[in-house]
């Protein structure tokens, strides 16, 4: 099922999007506060109201948890143990894609830290989110619109693949894969691999919502049918991809501390970090 259709189905089945809507922010954490002040040139006293206004417009488009709960201002890419490598590779001419980038907030972190904007790409299925990213960061003069591509990762005929197949050295995926069921995830991952050059060192860095007890999820899948991995299923996913593609991949995993899941209503939810390298 397409992620948009999943959401519509959940709403029909009684899911209340208000559960995903936090009260307006009163304070803003780092690093987003500094980025909006120093990079976007928004006066410090206006940063909070600016974020709240953009959040409300975005939530009206699609009531995702990442929007309603202000996840888009909880920047996480710099917390990855691979961040220094990702940043360095972009500074030396390699291309990075943030897939499922939402507002492109992680791209702005990279730019703020010195990555050349022309070496960065973002893609999201919602053009509205890409536009809202410009409203949030006020940086159309810095990040060219040509670097942001509205596309469905399942559509191999989309601009994402016609423009970028074989040209991306690093793909970053954050809280994106779980919206697909397992079999669709296999297809998504295979499509992502087509974006990478056929050479050793091509890298995929993932931040994945995971669950220590898969049984906990069974009662919720009719209402919100996401697929949260555990370590065993994550390993199985990549083994299946290797088997189907003939590629050799190195898969590293770690548990990544994350504020987002501290108050998750389901027990055993955590953030699984992973780095997949082509051998």
UniProtKB/Swiss-Prot annotation:
Phenotype seen when the gene is deleted: Impairs the synthesis of terretonin but accumulates 3,5-dimethylorsellinic acid (DMOA).
Enzyme class: transferase
Enzyme Commission number(s): 2.1.3.-
Residues binding S-adenosyl-L-methionine: 124-125, 152-153
Keyword Amino-acid biosynthesis: no
Keywords for this protein: S-adenosyl-L-methionine, Transferase
GO biological process: terpenoid biosynthetic process
Domain of life assignment: Eukaryota
Pathway this chain belongs to: Secondary metabolite biosynthesis; terpenoid biosynthesis
GO molecular function, one term: transferase activity
Gene3D superfamilies the UniProt entry points to: Vaccinia Virus protein VP39 (3.40.50.150)
Keyword Cytoplasm appears in the UniProt entry: no
Family: Belongs to the class I-like SAM-binding methyltransferase superfamily.
PANTHER family for this protein: METHYLTRANSFERASE AUSD
Subunit structure, interactors included: Homodimer.
Function: Methyltransferase; part of the gene cluster that mediates the biosynthesis of terretonin, a fungal meroterpenoid that acts as a mycotoxin. The first step of the pathway is the synthesis of 3,5-dimethylorsellinic acid (DMOA) by the polyketide synthase trt4. DMOA is then prenylated into farnesyl-DMOA by the polyprenyl transferase trt2. Methylation by the methyltransferase trt5 then leads to farnesyl-DMOA methyl ester which is further subject to epoxidation by the FAD-dependent monooxygenase trt8 to yield epoxyfarnesyl-DMOA methyl ester.
Protein name: Methyltransferase trt5
Species this chain originates from: Aspergillus terreus (strain NIH 2624 / FGSC A1156)
Organism phylogeny: Eukaryota, Fungi, Dikarya, Ascomycota, Pezizomycotina
Gene that specifies this protein: trt5
């Amino acid at each position: 099922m397409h992620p948009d259709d999943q959401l519509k189905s959940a709403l029909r089945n009684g899911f209340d999007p208000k559960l995903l809507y936090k009260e307006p922010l009163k304070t803003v954490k780092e690093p987003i506060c500094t980025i909006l002040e120093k990079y976007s040139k928004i006066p410090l006293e206006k940063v909070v109201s600016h974020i709240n206004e953009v959040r409300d417009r975005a939530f009206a488009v699609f009531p995702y948890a990442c929007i309603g709960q202000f996840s888009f201002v909880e920047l996480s890419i710099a917390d990855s143990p691979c961040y220094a490598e990702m940043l360095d590779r972009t500074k030396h001419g390699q291309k990075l894609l943030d897939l499922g980038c939402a507002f492109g907030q992680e791209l702005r972190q990279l730019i703020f830290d010195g990555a050349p904007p022309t070496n960065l790409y973002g893609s999201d299925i919602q053009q509205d989110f890409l536009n809202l990213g410009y409203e949030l960061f006020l940086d159309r003069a810095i990040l060219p619109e040509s670097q942001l591509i509205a596309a469905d990762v399942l559509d191999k005929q989309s601009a994402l693949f016609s423009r970028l197949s074989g040209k991306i050295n690093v793909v970053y995926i954050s809280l994106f894969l779980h919206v697909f069921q397992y079999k669709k995830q296999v297809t998504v991952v295979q499509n992502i691999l087509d974006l990478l050059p056929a050479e050793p060192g091509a890298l995929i860095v993932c931040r994945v919502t995971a669950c220590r007890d898969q049984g906990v999820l069974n009662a919720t899948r009719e209402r919100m049918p996401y697929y949260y991995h555990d370590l065993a299923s994550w390993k199985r996913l990549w083994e299946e991809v290797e088997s189907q593609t003939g590629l050799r991949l190195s898969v590293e995993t770690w548990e990544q501390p994350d504020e987002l899941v501290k108050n998750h209503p389901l027990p055993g939810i955590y953030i699984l970090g992973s780095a997949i390298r082509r051998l």
